[in-house]
Protein backbone atom coordinates (compact mmCIF):
# COMPACT_ATOMS: atom_id res chain seq x y z
CA UNK A 1 0.00 0.00 0.00
CA UNK A 2 1.37 3.38 -1.00
CA UNK A 3 2.24 5.87 1.73
CA UNK A 4 2.50 9.64 1.82
CA UNK A 5 6.30 9.22 1.59
CA UNK A 6 5.88 7.29 -1.68
CA UNK A 7 3.70 10.06 -3.10
CA UNK A 8 6.17 12.76 -2.06
CA UNK A 9 9.08 10.88 -3.64
CA UNK A 10 7.21 10.27 -6.89
CA UNK A 11 6.13 13.91 -7.13
CA UNK A 12 9.53 15.27 -6.13
CA UNK A 13 8.12 17.25 -3.20
CA UNK A 14 8.15 17.09 0.60
CA UNK A 15 5.62 15.11 2.61
CA UNK A 16 4.32 18.38 4.03
CA UNK A 17 3.51 19.59 0.50
CA UNK A 18 1.49 16.42 -0.10
CA UNK A 19 -0.33 17.05 3.17
CA UNK A 20 -1.12 20.61 2.14
CA UNK A 21 -2.51 19.42 -1.20
CA UNK A 22 -4.75 16.94 0.61
CA UNK A 23 -5.92 19.33 3.32
CA UNK A 24 -6.11 22.54 1.32
CA UNK A 25 -4.80 24.45 4.34
CA UNK A 26 -2.10 26.25 2.36
CA UNK A 27 -1.90 27.54 -1.22
CA UNK A 28 0.06 25.25 -3.53
CA UNK A 29 1.02 26.22 -7.09
CA UNK A 30 -1.00 24.62 -9.86
CA UNK A 31 1.98 22.72 -11.40
CA UNK A 32 3.01 21.31 -8.03
CA UNK A 33 -0.56 20.35 -7.16
CA UNK A 34 -0.88 18.61 -10.53
CA UNK A 35 2.33 16.60 -9.94
CA UNK A 36 1.11 15.50 -6.53
CA UNK A 37 -2.32 14.54 -7.83
CA UNK A 38 -0.75 12.54 -10.70
CA UNK A 39 1.45 10.70 -8.20
CA UNK A 40 -1.57 9.97 -6.00
CA UNK A 41 -3.50 8.56 -8.96
CA UNK A 42 -0.54 6.55 -10.29
CA UNK A 43 0.29 4.98 -6.93
CA UNK A 44 -3.31 4.50 -5.88
CA UNK A 45 -2.64 6.32 -2.64
CA UNK A 46 -5.76 6.57 -0.51
CA UNK A 47 -5.61 8.42 2.80
CA UNK A 48 -7.70 7.04 5.60
CA UNK A 49 -11.29 8.18 5.66
CA UNK A 50 -11.59 11.76 6.72
CA UNK A 51 -8.26 12.96 5.40
CA UNK A 52 -9.92 15.84 3.58
CA UNK A 53 -12.63 16.50 6.10
CA UNK A 54 -12.41 15.28 9.65
CA UNK A 55 -15.57 13.56 10.71
CA UNK A 56 -17.75 15.66 12.93
CA UNK A 57 -18.15 12.91 15.51
CA UNK A 58 -15.54 12.70 18.27
CA UNK A 59 -13.38 9.66 18.89
CA UNK A 60 -12.48 10.72 22.44
CA UNK A 61 -8.86 9.78 21.71
CA UNK A 62 -5.75 11.96 21.81
CA UNK A 63 -2.64 10.74 20.01
CA UNK A 64 0.63 11.21 21.87
CA UNK A 65 3.71 10.94 19.67
CA UNK A 66 6.56 10.12 22.06
CA UNK A 67 9.36 8.57 19.97
CA UNK A 68 11.63 6.21 21.90
CA UNK A 69 14.76 7.32 20.07
CA UNK A 70 18.36 6.52 20.93
CA UNK A 71 19.56 8.75 23.76
CA UNK A 72 16.19 9.60 25.31
CA UNK A 73 15.51 8.97 28.99
CA UNK A 74 12.60 6.54 28.99
CA UNK A 75 11.74 7.11 32.70
CA UNK A 76 11.47 10.86 32.07
CA UNK A 77 9.46 10.29 28.88
CA UNK A 78 7.04 8.21 30.93
CA UNK A 79 6.54 11.12 33.34
CA UNK A 80 5.37 13.23 30.40
CA UNK A 81 3.16 10.33 29.28
CA UNK A 82 1.66 10.02 32.77
CA UNK A 83 0.75 13.71 32.76
CA UNK A 84 -0.90 13.46 29.35
CA UNK A 85 -2.85 10.30 30.20
CA UNK A 86 -4.01 11.56 33.60
CA UNK A 87 -5.21 14.90 32.26
CA UNK A 88 -6.82 13.33 29.19
CA UNK A 89 -9.02 11.21 31.46
CA UNK A 90 -10.28 14.42 33.07
CA UNK A 91 -11.63 15.28 29.61
CA UNK A 92 -13.01 11.75 29.12
CA UNK A 93 -10.36 11.03 26.49
CA UNK A 94 -8.06 8.04 26.07
CA UNK A 95 -4.52 8.28 24.71
CA UNK A 96 -3.07 6.50 21.69
CA UNK A 97 0.69 6.26 22.30
CA UNK A 98 2.89 6.40 19.20
CA UNK A 99 6.53 5.49 19.85
CA UNK A 100 7.81 5.77 16.28
CA UNK A 101 8.99 9.06 14.77
CA UNK A 102 8.19 8.52 11.08
CA UNK A 103 6.12 11.03 9.15
CA UNK A 104 4.08 8.22 7.59
CA UNK A 105 2.83 7.19 11.02
CA UNK A 106 1.82 10.76 11.72
CA UNK A 107 -0.01 10.93 8.39
CA UNK A 108 -1.81 7.66 9.12
CA UNK A 109 -3.11 8.96 12.44
CA UNK A 110 -4.04 12.48 11.39
CA UNK A 111 -5.26 11.51 7.93
CA UNK A 112 -8.26 9.59 9.21
CA UNK A 113 -10.74 9.83 12.05
CA UNK A 114 -8.68 7.87 14.56
CA UNK A 115 -8.04 10.76 16.96
CA UNK A 116 -9.48 14.12 17.94
CA UNK A 117 -6.16 15.83 18.63
CA UNK A 118 -2.42 15.27 18.84
CA UNK A 119 0.39 16.00 21.29
CA UNK A 120 3.94 15.65 19.94
CA UNK A 121 7.16 15.25 21.95
CA UNK A 122 10.93 15.22 21.43
CA UNK A 123 10.82 18.15 19.05
CA UNK A 124 13.84 18.90 16.88
CA UNK A 125 14.89 22.42 15.92
CA UNK A 126 13.88 21.70 12.30
CA UNK A 127 11.42 18.87 12.85
CA UNK A 128 10.01 17.22 9.69
CA UNK A 129 6.85 16.28 11.59
CA UNK A 130 5.89 19.89 12.30
CA UNK A 131 4.66 20.89 8.80
CA UNK A 132 2.69 17.65 8.55
CA UNK A 133 1.00 18.30 11.89
CA UNK A 134 0.40 21.92 10.91
CA UNK A 135 -1.39 20.74 7.76
CA UNK A 136 -3.62 18.31 9.64
CA UNK A 137 -7.19 19.19 10.55
CA UNK A 138 -6.80 18.03 14.14
CA UNK A 139 -5.34 20.51 16.65
CA UNK A 140 -1.77 19.73 17.67
CA UNK A 141 0.31 20.93 20.62
CA UNK A 142 4.08 20.45 20.74
CA UNK A 143 5.95 19.62 23.92
CA UNK A 144 9.05 21.44 22.78
CA UNK A 145 9.90 24.52 20.76
CA UNK A 146 11.13 24.20 17.16
CA UNK A 147 12.67 27.08 15.25
CA UNK A 148 9.42 27.51 13.34
CA UNK A 149 6.28 26.08 14.99
CA UNK A 150 4.31 26.86 11.79
CA UNK A 151 1.31 28.09 13.75
CA UNK A 152 1.24 25.22 16.26
CA UNK A 153 1.04 25.85 19.99
CA UNK A 154 4.00 24.83 22.15
CA UNK A 155 4.65 24.18 25.83
CA UNK A 156 7.91 23.33 27.58
CA UNK A 157 10.30 24.28 30.34
CA UNK A 158 12.15 27.46 29.43
CA UNK A 159 15.44 25.63 28.85
CA UNK A 160 17.18 28.79 27.68
CA UNK A 161 16.36 30.43 31.01
CA UNK A 162 17.32 27.21 32.83
CA UNK A 163 20.81 27.33 31.34
CA UNK A 164 21.20 30.95 32.38
CA UNK A 165 19.89 30.24 35.87
CA UNK A 166 22.34 27.37 36.42
CA UNK A 167 25.31 29.53 35.42
CA UNK A 168 24.16 32.43 37.60
CA UNK A 169 23.85 30.10 40.58
CA UNK A 170 27.39 28.80 40.16
CA UNK A 171 28.85 32.25 39.50
CA UNK A 172 27.15 33.62 42.61
CA UNK A 173 28.76 30.81 44.62
CA UNK A 174 32.20 31.84 43.35
CA UNK A 175 32.79 29.44 40.48
CA UNK A 176 34.58 30.82 37.43
CA UNK A 177 35.38 27.56 35.60
CA UNK A 178 32.16 25.78 34.76
CA UNK A 179 31.27 22.75 32.64
CA UNK A 180 28.17 21.20 31.16
CA UNK A 181 27.91 17.43 30.99
CA UNK A 182 25.07 17.36 28.55
CA UNK A 183 22.85 15.24 26.38
CA UNK A 184 24.04 12.14 24.50
CA UNK A 185 25.72 12.74 21.12
CA UNK A 186 22.72 11.25 19.28
CA UNK A 187 20.41 13.83 20.86
CA UNK A 188 22.72 16.67 19.82
CA UNK A 189 23.13 15.30 16.28
CA UNK A 190 19.35 15.38 15.89
CA UNK A 191 19.41 19.04 16.98
CA UNK A 192 16.86 18.25 19.65
CA UNK A 193 15.41 21.60 20.62
CA UNK A 194 15.55 21.38 24.42
CA UNK A 195 19.26 20.48 24.44
CA UNK A 196 20.18 23.28 22.05
CA UNK A 197 18.13 25.82 23.98
CA UNK A 198 19.79 24.97 27.29
CA UNK A 199 23.27 25.23 25.77
CA UNK A 200 22.40 28.56 24.20
CA UNK A 201 21.23 30.00 27.51
CA UNK A 202 24.24 28.63 29.34
CA UNK A 203 26.72 30.09 26.87
CA UNK A 204 24.96 33.45 26.73
CA UNK A 205 25.00 33.79 30.52
CA UNK A 206 28.63 32.65 30.74
CA UNK A 207 29.60 35.41 28.32
CA UNK A 208 27.65 37.99 30.31
CA UNK A 209 29.18 36.78 33.59
CA UNK A 210 32.71 36.59 32.19
CA UNK A 211 33.28 32.93 33.02
CA UNK A 212 34.39 29.97 30.94
CA UNK A 213 32.16 27.02 30.14
CA UNK A 214 33.27 23.70 28.65
CA UNK A 215 30.64 21.42 27.11
CA UNK A 216 30.92 17.63 27.07
CA UNK A 217 28.34 15.45 25.34
CA UNK A 218 27.71 12.32 27.38
CA UNK A 219 26.25 8.90 26.68
CA UNK A 220 23.77 7.81 29.35
CA UNK A 221 25.86 4.79 30.35
CA UNK A 222 28.46 4.17 33.07
CA UNK A 223 31.19 4.05 30.45
CA UNK A 224 29.94 7.17 28.68
CA UNK A 225 29.69 9.11 31.92
CA UNK A 226 33.16 8.04 33.03
CA UNK A 227 34.63 9.08 29.69
CA UNK A 228 32.92 12.48 29.88
CA UNK A 229 34.18 13.11 33.41
CA UNK A 230 37.70 11.92 32.57
CA UNK A 231 37.84 14.11 29.45
CA UNK A 232 36.56 17.10 31.38
CA UNK A 233 39.06 16.75 34.22
CA UNK A 234 41.91 16.16 31.76
CA UNK A 235 41.15 19.14 29.53
CA UNK A 236 39.77 21.53 32.14
CA UNK A 237 41.21 20.43 35.50
CA UNK A 238 40.37 23.81 37.05
CA UNK A 239 36.62 23.09 36.76
CA UNK A 240 34.79 23.44 40.09
CA UNK A 241 31.19 23.82 38.94
CA UNK A 242 29.36 21.26 36.80
CA UNK A 243 25.88 21.36 35.29
CA UNK A 244 24.49 17.93 34.38
CA UNK A 245 21.67 17.84 31.84
CA UNK A 246 21.40 14.09 31.36
CA UNK A 247 19.18 12.14 33.75
CA UNK A 248 20.48 8.73 32.74
CA UNK A 249 24.12 9.70 33.17
CA UNK A 250 23.71 11.64 36.43
CA UNK A 251 24.37 8.78 38.92
CA UNK A 252 27.33 7.58 36.87
CA UNK A 253 28.80 11.10 36.70
CA UNK A 254 28.60 11.36 40.49
CA UNK A 255 30.16 7.92 40.90
CA UNK A 256 33.07 8.77 38.60
CA UNK A 257 33.69 12.09 40.33
CA UNK A 258 33.91 10.20 43.62
CA UNK A 259 36.33 7.69 42.09
CA UNK A 260 38.48 10.59 40.92
CA UNK A 261 38.56 12.02 44.44
CA UNK A 262 36.21 14.96 43.85
CA UNK A 263 33.89 15.50 46.81
CA UNK A 264 30.58 16.82 45.48
CA UNK A 265 29.19 19.46 47.79
CA UNK A 266 32.63 20.31 49.19
CA UNK A 267 35.20 20.89 46.46
CA UNK A 268 32.92 20.35 43.47
CA UNK A 269 29.50 21.93 42.97
CA UNK A 270 27.02 20.06 40.77
CA UNK A 271 23.67 21.34 39.50
CA UNK A 272 21.32 18.90 37.79
CA UNK A 273 18.58 19.79 35.32
CA UNK A 274 16.08 16.99 35.88
CA UNK A 275 12.81 16.03 37.56
CA UNK A 276 12.90 16.52 41.33
CA UNK A 277 12.51 12.80 42.06
CA UNK A 278 15.66 12.12 40.02
CA UNK A 279 17.57 14.80 41.94
CA UNK A 280 16.50 13.36 45.29
CA UNK A 281 17.34 9.74 44.40
CA UNK A 282 21.11 10.29 43.99
CA UNK A 283 23.86 9.47 46.49
CA UNK A 284 23.35 12.97 47.90
CA UNK A 285 20.34 15.24 47.34
CA UNK A 286 21.19 17.30 44.29
CA UNK A 287 20.83 21.01 43.78
CA UNK A 288 18.55 20.99 40.76
CA UNK A 289 16.47 22.90 38.29
CA UNK A 290 13.25 20.96 38.18
CA UNK A 291 11.93 19.53 34.92
CA UNK A 292 8.19 19.30 35.75
CA UNK A 293 7.52 16.65 33.12
CA UNK A 294 4.14 15.49 34.40
CA UNK A 295 2.87 19.06 34.77
CA UNK A 296 4.01 19.92 31.24
CA UNK A 297 2.10 16.90 29.94
CA UNK A 298 -1.05 18.08 31.70
CA UNK A 299 -0.70 21.62 30.33
CA UNK A 300 -0.28 20.22 26.82
CA UNK A 301 -3.62 18.42 27.13
CA UNK A 302 -5.33 21.55 28.49
CA UNK A 303 -4.03 23.51 25.51
CA UNK A 304 -4.98 20.97 22.86
CA UNK A 305 -8.46 20.45 24.32
CA UNK A 306 -9.05 24.21 24.37
CA UNK A 307 -8.22 24.28 20.66
CA UNK A 308 -10.47 21.31 20.02
CA UNK A 309 -13.42 23.07 21.63
CA UNK A 310 -13.00 26.44 19.92
CA UNK A 311 -10.86 28.40 17.48
CA UNK A 312 -8.01 29.95 19.45
CA UNK A 313 -4.79 31.61 18.34
CA UNK A 314 -1.61 29.61 18.75
CA UNK A 315 0.50 30.29 21.81
CA UNK A 316 3.80 29.28 23.36
CA UNK A 317 3.99 28.62 27.10
CA UNK A 318 7.47 28.33 28.56
CA UNK A 319 7.48 27.40 32.25
CA UNK A 320 9.91 29.46 34.32
CA UNK A 321 12.75 27.35 35.75
CA UNK A 322 13.00 26.93 39.51
CA UNK A 323 16.33 26.08 41.19
CA UNK A 324 16.34 24.36 44.58
CA UNK A 325 19.65 24.33 46.44
CA UNK A 326 20.54 21.08 48.20
CA UNK A 327 23.66 19.24 49.33
CA UNK A 328 25.55 19.17 46.02
CA UNK A 329 26.23 22.92 46.07
CA UNK A 330 29.59 24.25 47.22
CA UNK A 331 31.33 27.62 47.25
CA UNK A 332 33.83 28.20 44.47
CA UNK A 333 37.45 29.38 44.67
CA UNK A 334 36.43 33.03 44.32
CA UNK A 335 34.08 32.80 47.28
CA UNK A 336 30.37 33.61 47.23
CA UNK A 337 29.35 36.95 45.81
CA UNK A 338 27.43 39.33 48.03
Ranges and model annotations:
Residues 1-60, 333-338:
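N-terminal helix-turn-helix DNA-binding module of bacterial transcription factors
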Residues 2, 61-168, 234:
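Alpha-helical recognition/docking segments in bacterial nutrient-uptake
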Residues 14, 60, 116, 176-177, ...:
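Short acidic/polar active-site loop segments enriched in Thr and Asp
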Residues 17-20, 57-70, 177-187:
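Short beta-strand segments enriched in small/hydrophobic residues
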Residues 43, 173-175, 232-238:
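Glycine-rich phosphate-binding loop signature in dinucleotide/nucleotide-binding domains
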Residues 67-75, 100-103, 155-165, 181-228, ...:
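Hinge/beta->alpha junction and helix N-cap segments in small-molecule ligand-binding domains
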Residues 226, 235-338:
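Flexible loop/turn connectors
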Amino acid sequence: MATIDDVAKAAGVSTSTVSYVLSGKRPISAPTRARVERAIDKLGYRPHAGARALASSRTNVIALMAPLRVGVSVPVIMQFVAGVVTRARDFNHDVLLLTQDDVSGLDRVTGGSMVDALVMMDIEADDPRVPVAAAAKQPTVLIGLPQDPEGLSCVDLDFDAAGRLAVRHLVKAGHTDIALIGSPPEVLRRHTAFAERLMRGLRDQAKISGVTVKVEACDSTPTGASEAVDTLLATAPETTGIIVHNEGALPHVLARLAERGAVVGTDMSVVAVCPTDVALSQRIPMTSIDLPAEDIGKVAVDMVMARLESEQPSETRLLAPVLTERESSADGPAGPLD
